[in-house]
């Protein structure tokens, strides 16, 4: 949606456009691992739509589409607001793929936005803290093993990022970095 709006704006499309999204911020998903590692800031990886839209003909509307009336050419939001259109572009986004791996949905963090990256960072740091304080080798091994579901570009990038980050974080807790395992499924 954002790319379409910006492209039309750059081509000087003369008609008013509405970009409707349920989130306030756009997510550069391939860069979420950079937010996790603090190599980039929240605003770089997860900027507000309003900051990206420097175009007089595009208006950002935060909301969730409840219905589309094709006959009336109207988009209705769950807030009760509705918007008329002459042309409609639907961009529905994506969903996480767990590749049929049992338990993956329930036992993993989906990395979909900045909040997910922050939650994952906090979770990993808490596990490292726990591991540094336990003398039980088996429990420590469990705490220091991270599995990544998905061996595509994002999964491999995440594995590489965690392979760098976790030892840095664990070293600060005086932990043995050789005990850390990052596994890609």
Where are these regions (language model features)?
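Beta1-alpha1 glycine-rich phosphate/pyrophosphate-binding loop at the start
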Residues: 1-62, 66-67, 147, 153-185
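FAD-binding core/adjacent interface of flavoenzyme oxidoreductases
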Residues: 57-147, 165
């Amino acid at each position: 949606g954002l790319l379409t709006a910006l492209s039309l704006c750059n081509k000087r499309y003369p008609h008013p456009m509405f970009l409707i999204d349920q989130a306030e911020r756009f997510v550069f998903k391939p860069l979420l691992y950079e937010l996790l590692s603090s190599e980039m800031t929240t605003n770089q990886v997860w900027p507000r739509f309003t900051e990206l839209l420097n175009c007089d003909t595009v208006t950002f509307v935060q909301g969730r589409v409840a219905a589309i009336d094709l006959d009336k050419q109207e988009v209705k939001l769950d807030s009760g607001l509705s918007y008329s259109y002459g042309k409609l572009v639907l961009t529905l986004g994506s969903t996480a793929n767990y590749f049929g791996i049992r338990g993956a949905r329930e036992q993993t963090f989906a990395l979909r936005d900045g909040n997910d990256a922050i939650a994952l960072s906090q979770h990993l740091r808490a596990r490292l803290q726990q591991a540094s304080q336990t003398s039980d080798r088996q429990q420590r091994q469990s705490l220091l093993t991270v599995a990544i579901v998905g061996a595509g570009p994002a999964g491999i990038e995440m594995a590489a990022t965690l392979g760098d980050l976790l030892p840095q974080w664990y070293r600060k807790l005086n932990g043995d970095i050789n005990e850390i395992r990052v596994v890609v499924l």
